[in-house]
């Protein structure tokens, strides 16, 4: 389609909105200075359960204002509430948002980054018309009801049952490692609807009301002491057939579409509060607690820096290559592998330089603060599918290698 306004015109519009809505970041405050401010670090921006209410109000308020200003779904189709512009327009505005002090928007990532794009691709026009505007406006919080105690990376082994009852389905089963379930309004749920069919062909996907009778959400406490995940019990939860996504027994394709977005980590929500921050912070650790003249330390720093730059360049290239409504292909999974490689190189450097400071709080700024990051890193290797599963998928679907022998 032909864009109706230029990127510069959109940015001028976006800048006016942001100036009137949120404060701009102070360049001096953003500049990293060792020992100044909080030394807190997280792998990802997190939602504190104790402050969930105020976080939700702030995130939903900003998302609603952004959407009402025509900036909430810039590359979405007009018929579903989008602006109808290009992916380049959307990326340009997301980068502009990064210059402002936005509220914590991580609670919206599943809706805007994973489920919203998937629904646009595979859901019925009725579902798209009804739900997509609400998702991109921040009116609805989403979660993914995929993993189960006996079906993690192998989602085709899902055992949660959905039994037809007239115009409704009764869903019974257990899901685990569900982010945002405690705050969600809807969950996209994969269920087994034909136990006699091959496991990939007997699945159907539904949108479940997380406030419905029979839904029980319980927090899971991680080794960091936080509870960013949940287990969800479904006991004969009634779901109308109108909330089915895709055809009956064709749910595995829906799963792949959602995971294509998750594993590529291409989301319109600007990331603030997660990650290691500027490379200067990593150098500061080596300078304060190690020896910058040591050749091994310098080699480790070079490896970490190279991985950071490679990730940035790969992410920029892949995001720019996506067209509106296009589902990321399996090659996007290389991002997940690259992220884990970077984290491992960083954790190795931190262990060598900080030693016991990683597990014993000595009160030194910038030392024990890394403990949360290090403890959270193993989960990033598993989230969105274990690395072994991801490598198999890349080998088979990108490189054309033969499938693994199966029993």
Describe the role of every protein-language-model region.
Residues 5, 215-312, 380:
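Glycine-rich beta->alpha junctions and the first turn(s) of the following alpha-helix
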Residues 138-146, 188:
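A short, Trp-centered hydrophobic/proline-enriched beta-strand micro-motif
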Residues 30, 295-298, 309-364:
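C-terminal helix-coil-helix/basic helical segment that borders enzyme active sites and/or dimer interfaces
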Residues 107-126, 152:
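N-terminal glycine-rich flavin-associated loop
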Residues 160-163:
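A structural signal for short hydrophobic beta-strand segments in well-ordered beta-sheet cores
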Residues 11, 92-93, 114, 254-269, ...:
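Glycine-rich phosphate/cofactor-binding loops in nucleotide/flavin-utilizing enzymes
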Residues 167, 172-218:
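A short core secondary-structure module
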């Amino acid at each position: 389609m032909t864009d109706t306004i230029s990127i510069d015109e959109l940015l001028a519009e976006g800048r006016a909105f942001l100036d009137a809505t949120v404060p701009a970041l102070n360049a001096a405050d953003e500049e990293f200075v060792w020992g100044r401010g909080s030394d807190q670090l997280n792998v990802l921006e997190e939602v504190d359960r104790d402050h969930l209410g105020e976080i939700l109000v702030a995130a939903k308020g900003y998302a609603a204002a952004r959407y009402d200003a025509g900036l909430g779904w810039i590359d979405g189709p007009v018929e579903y509430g989008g602006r109808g512009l290009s992916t380049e327009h959307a990326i340009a505005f997301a980068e502009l948002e990064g210059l402002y002090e936005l509220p914590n928007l991580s609670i919206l990532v599943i809706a805007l980054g994973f489920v919203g794009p998937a629904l646009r691709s595979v859901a019925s026009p009725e579902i798209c018309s009804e739900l997509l505007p609400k998702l991109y406006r921040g009116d609805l919080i989403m979660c993914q009801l995929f993993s189960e105690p006996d079906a993690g990376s192998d989602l085709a082994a899902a055992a949660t049952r959905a039994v037809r009852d007239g115009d409704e389905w009764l869903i019974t089963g257990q899901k685990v490692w569900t982010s945002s379930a405690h705050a969600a309004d809807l969950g996209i749920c994969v269920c087994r609807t034909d136990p006699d069919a091959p496991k990939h062909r007997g699945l159907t996907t539904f949108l479940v009301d997380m406030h419905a009778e029979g839904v029980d959400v319980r927090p899971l406490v991680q080794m960091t002491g936080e509870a960013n995940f949940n287990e969800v019990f479904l006991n004969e939860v009634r779901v109308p057939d109108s909330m089915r996504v895709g055809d009956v027994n064709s749910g595995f394709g829906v799963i792949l579409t959602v995971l294509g977005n998750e594993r590529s980590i291409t989301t319109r929500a600007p990331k603030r509060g997660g990650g290691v921050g500027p490379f200067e912070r990593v150098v500061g650790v080596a300078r304060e607690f190690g020896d910058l003249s040591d050749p091994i330390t310098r080699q480790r720093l070079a490896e970490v820096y190279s991985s950071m730059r490679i990730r940035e360049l790969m992410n920029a290239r892949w995001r720019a290559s996506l067209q509106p409504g296009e589902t990321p292909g399996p090659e996007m999974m290389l991002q997940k592998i690259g992220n884990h490689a970077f984290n491992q190189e960083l954790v190795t450097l931190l262990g060598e330089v900080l030693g016991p400071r990683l597990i014993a709080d000595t009160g030194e700024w910038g030392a024990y603060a890394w403990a949360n990051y290090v403890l959270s890193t193993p989960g990033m290797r598993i989230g969105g599918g274990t690395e072994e599963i991801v490598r198999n998928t890349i080998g088979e679907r990108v490189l054309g290698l033969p499938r693994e022998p199966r029993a």
